[in-house]
């Protein structure tokens, strides 16, 4: 097609270069190595359980959900805002027991601060420092609604909120 400065360049789909995507996985076929994302779903559909299973899998190099292999094992850091620390401990212990793991041997860390607000500069700074110290492979912050006071329906607000997290907070 001739070059025309008034139009955008186009090419037939069949003429596009064929190249398989080069994805690096943290958890094969489930979560990308440098991914920042949200586990979404209806209330009470086990989103928190999935996130915690992912964290335990990364920390222990055991398959997530018994199926998805961990490609980059390492420490995991979690903040579960809706659960008491004893409840978090009990959940992790139950997952460990199911997998035959010793909880004391895991690089699974829990933020014990009662509240974390990603829309506050001080909390962002403290999270950045924690991430720099622990260098986790996976950070789980659950649930998003308890981590800010912004408009969840505003893509701009949520993007500003998650951008520092994606950069290692």
Predicted regions and their residues:
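Conserved glycine(s) of the Walker
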Residues: 46-47
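Short hydrophobic/aromatic beta-strand immediately N-terminal to the Walker A/P-loop
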Residues: 37-40, 77
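Conserved inter-motif catalytic segment of the P-loop NTP-binding fold
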Residues: 4-6, 21, 26-27, 63, ...
């Amino acid at each position: 097609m001739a070059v025309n400065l008034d139009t955008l360049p186009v090419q037939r789909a069949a003429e596009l270069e064929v190249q398989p995507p080069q994805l690096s996985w943290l958890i094969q076929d489930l979560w990308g190595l440098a991914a920042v994302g949200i586990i979404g779903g209806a209330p009470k559909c086990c989103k928190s359980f999935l996130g915690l299973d992912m964290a335990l899998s990364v920390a222990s190099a055991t398959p997530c959900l018994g199926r998805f292999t961990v490609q980059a094992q390492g420490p995991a850091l979690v903040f579960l805002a809706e659960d008491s620390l004893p409840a978090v401990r009990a959940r992790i212990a139950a997952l460990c027991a199911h997998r035959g793991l010793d909880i004391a041997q895991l690089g699974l860390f829990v933020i014990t601060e009662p509240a974390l607000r990603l829309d506050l500069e001080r909390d962002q700074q403290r999270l950045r420092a924690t991430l720099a110290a622990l260098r986790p492979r996976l950070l789980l912050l659950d649930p998003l609604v308890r981590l800010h006071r912004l408009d969840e329906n505003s893509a701009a607000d949520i993007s500003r909120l998650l951008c520092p997290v994606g950069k290692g907070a």
